[in-house]
UniProtKB/Swiss-Prot annotation:
Keywords: Antimicrobial, Bacteriolytic enzyme, Cytolysis, Glycosidase, Host cell inner membrane, Host cell lysis by virus, Host cell membrane, Host membrane, Hydrolase, Membrane, Signal-anchor, Transmembrane, Transmembrane helix, Viral release from host cell
Membrane topology value: Single-pass type II membrane protein
Gene name in the database record: 19
An example molecular function term from Gene Ontology annotations: lysozyme activity
Thylakoid recorded as keyword: no
Protein name: SAR-endolysin
UniProt-annotated catalytic positions: 37 (proton donor/acceptor), 46 (proton donor/acceptor)
Primary role: Signal-arrest-release (SAR) endolysin with lysozyme activity that degrades host peptidoglycans and participates with the pinholin and spanin proteins in the sequential events which lead to programmed host cell lysis releasing the mature viral particles. Once the pinholin has permeabilized the host cell membrane, the SAR-endolysin is released into the periplasm where it breaks down the peptidoglycan layer.
GO CC field: host cell plasma membrane; membrane
TM spans (from-to): 10-32
Domain notes per entry: The signal-anchor, which may also be an uncleaved signal sequence tethers the SAR-endolysin to the membrane until the latter is depolarized by the holin, resulting in the escape of SAR-endolysin from the membrane.
């Protein structure tokens, strides 16, 4: 599935804000609830049983039964993306475009830094093979041992943005 024109335009507008801004727009979408994660203000269990809230935030700080505000959700996302950046930036040993970095932040926000650090995707980045690294995103479409259409769509969008700097 191709990226919607509205999401494409929003991501392009975020480029000047850097990789965290790009990842944030990918996750939240142009309308704030139509991105790669969607938003839910009440905690719920995701497809693999992890307590989740807002734009996919997980962690011990989630309060079951609480209804989160949009501002709280955006603050959690920003905090989470700053954490993602700190976790993965030291492992990226080559210069990459901000669009590639933003797509990687979105990806790692979804799969976790541990998975990224041991991935072929990271190895390809550090070998200077940006296209090969971006193509690796298509392999990450499973959760709980099952392939998910939503993850397939997400990875295609992330791959598209990942490759923007190569075009």
């Amino acid at each position: 599935m191709a990226m919607s024109p509205a999401l494409r335009n929003s991501v392009m507008a975020a480029i000047s804000g850097g990789a965290i801004a790009i990842a944030s727009v990918l996750i939240t979408g142009p309308g704030g609830n139509d991105g790669l994660e969607g938003v839910r203000y009440k905690p719920y269990k995701d497809v693999v049983g992890v307590l989740t809230v807002c734009y996919g935030h997980t962690g011990k700080d989630i309060m079951p039964g609480k209804t989160y505000t949009e501002a709280e959700c955006k603050a959690l996302l920003n905090k989470d993306l700053i954490t993602v950046a700190r976790q993965i930036n030291p492992y990226i040993k080559v210069d990459i475009p901000e669009t590639t970095r933003g797509a990687l932040y979105s990806f790692v926000y979804n799969v976790g830094a541990g998975n990224f650090r041991t991935s072929t995707l990271l190895r390809k980045i550090n070998q200077g093979d940006i296209k090969g690294a971006c193509d690796q995103l298509r392999r990450w479409t499973y959760a709980g041992g099952k392939q998910w259409k939503g993850l397939m769509t997400r990875r295609e969008v992330e791959r598209d943005v990942c490759l923007w700097g190569k075009q």
